[in-house]
């Protein structure tokens, strides 16, 4: 078992490493509120399609 076997061998059941964006699988800037589970970049892209409106 070489180094590639140890890379993702630790179980990720909780914490930042266990969650990812449902669109692009990114782990940074995740919006979990309301069960969105999207990174902020994908949220900006799909916010209008989801039904969010930008208030002035």
UniProtKB/Swiss-Prot annotation:
InterPro entries (alphabetical): Ribosomal_uS14 (IPR001209), Ribosomal_uS14_CS (IPR018271), RIbosomal_uS14_euk_arc (IPR039744), Ribosomal_uS14_sf (IPR043140)
Cellular localization per UniProt: Cytoplasm, Cytosol; Cytoplasm; Rough endoplasmic reticulum
GO molecular function, one term: structural constituent of ribosome
Coiled coil: none
Residue numbers binding Zn(2+): 21, 24, 39, 42
GO cellular component: cytoplasmic side of rough endoplasmic reticulum membrane; cytosolic small ribosomal subunit; ribosome
Name under which the protein is recorded: Small ribosomal subunit protein uS14
Gene for this chain: RPS29
């Amino acid at each position: 078992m070489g180094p590639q076997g140890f890379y993702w061998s630790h179980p990720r059941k909780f914490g930042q490493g266990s969650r990812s964006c449902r669109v692009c699988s990114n782990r940074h800037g995740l919006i979990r509120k309301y069960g969105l589970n999207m990174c902020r970049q994908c949220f900006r892209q799909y916010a209008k399609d989801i039904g969010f409106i930008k208030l002035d």
